[in-house]
Design a protein with these regions (language model features):
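Histidine-acidic metal/acid-base catalytic patches
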Residues: 1-6, 13-31, 63, 109, ...
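Active-site-proximal loop/turn and secondary-structure-junction residues that shape catalytic pockets
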Residues: 11-13, 39-41, 75-78, 117-121, ...
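Short coil-to-beta-strand
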Residues: 30-33, 62-74, 106-117, 217-219
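A short beta-strand-loop structural module common to alpha/beta enzyme folds
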Residues: 33-43
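Aromatic-lined substrate-binding rim segments of carbohydrate-active enzymes
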Residues: 48-66
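Active-site acidic/histidine proton-transfer and metal-coordination neighborhood
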Residues: 64, 81-189
């Protein structure tokens, strides 16, 4: 199996937002060359002039540090209802938002991108589930043709942890993917997160890797414990109690027929005195742990 190691840039939100800063950290402190850019660092709602100036900065920074921007994704502050918003006008706004997001990604060289599938409110989950899921499917289908024009090879969505947020079972994730792919410009695939704690009957991450790894060009990696998504680093302290073992992850993917994937760290540090000053050290330790298996 062909493997690469990189990081989702969620760790940089509010902390290392300057392109020159996060690019230097990724390349020199973490010894990584691949990133997943996130919308929270350059929101498509921002004015065009500002977006264009920031794109120039980002391009210069990644060129200087020889970094590849392989994909673009939503993140903490863009984890919203979007294509399954109960309001039709809001759904249209978010559809156009995604089109602009994928354009931003294309400017940075991305070949895939995506988000969670969509989120229902408690009220819409009870009253309009089928209609809004179909709206989500149609939205992603339209985006797949748009992304094809931008040079993308696929779109990806991330299975989430509760029914309202879609994909909390393997079968549901496959069904959503297949429904989009019934009429698509480029295929919809999966961005697995090995730390998500979905349906109570399916909380072991390794069967997910076996069953969906072959359609997961990107896998979010984090250390965690059973029944909780910790987004913890792969440090000795967390590895001692955590359920994620790099060799087991790779073995499960290979068993499921995965031929190629990019492991992207999605590690979070809350704003707390005990974690604020060891973010980079924890990320670097996580890279050292995974480098035993992912050599590139």
């Amino acid at each position: 199996m062909k493997m690469k190691l990189g990081t989702n840039l969620g760790f940089a939100i509010n902390k290392y937002i300057e392109p020159e800063v996060w690019a230097k950290i990724v390349r020199e402190d973490l010894d990584l060359k691949s990133v997943q850019f996130v919308a929270d660092l350059l929101n498509p709602f921002l004015p065009d002039d500002y977006i264009n100036s920031q794109l120039m900065r980002i391009k210069e920074a990644v060129k200087k540090y020889d970094i590849s921007v392989d994909s673009i994704f939503t993140s903490a502050f863009t984890r919203v209802n979007h294509l399954m918003n109960p309001d039709a006008e809001a759904r249209k706004i978010w559809l156009n938002w995604f089109k602009k997001l994928f354009w931003i990604g294309s400017e940075l060289g991305c070949k895939t991108g995506g988000s969670h599938f969509g989120i229902l409110t408690f009220d819409s989950f009870e009253k309009n589930y089928d209609f809004l899921v179909e709206e989500g499917v149609k939205g992603w289908q339209e985006l797949s043709f748009h992304a094809k024009e931008l040079g993308y090879e696929s779109l990806i969505f991330e299975p989430m942890s509760v029914p309202r947020e879609m994909g909390n079972r393997v079968s549901e994730s496959i069904d959503l993917m297949n429904r989009v792919n019934a009429n698509c410009g480029i295929p919809m695939k999966i961005c697995l997160d090995i730390g998500h704690a979905p349906h109570p009957d399916e909380r072991d991450p390794y069967p997910w890797l076996e069953k969906l790894g072959s359609v997961s060009p990107i896998v979010h990696i984090q250390q965690t414990v059973l029944n909780k998504s910790n987004h913890a680093p792969f440090t000795p302290e967390h590895n001692e109690t955590g359920i994620i073992k790099a060799d087991k992850v790779i073995a499960a993917l290979e068993k499921g027929g995965c031929e190629e994937t990019i492991f992207m760290f999605e590690i979070g540090h809350r704003e707390h005195w005990d974690t604020e000053f060891k973010i980079i050290a924890d990320l670097a330790e996580s890279t050292r742990y995974w480098r035993e298996w992912v050599k590139e």
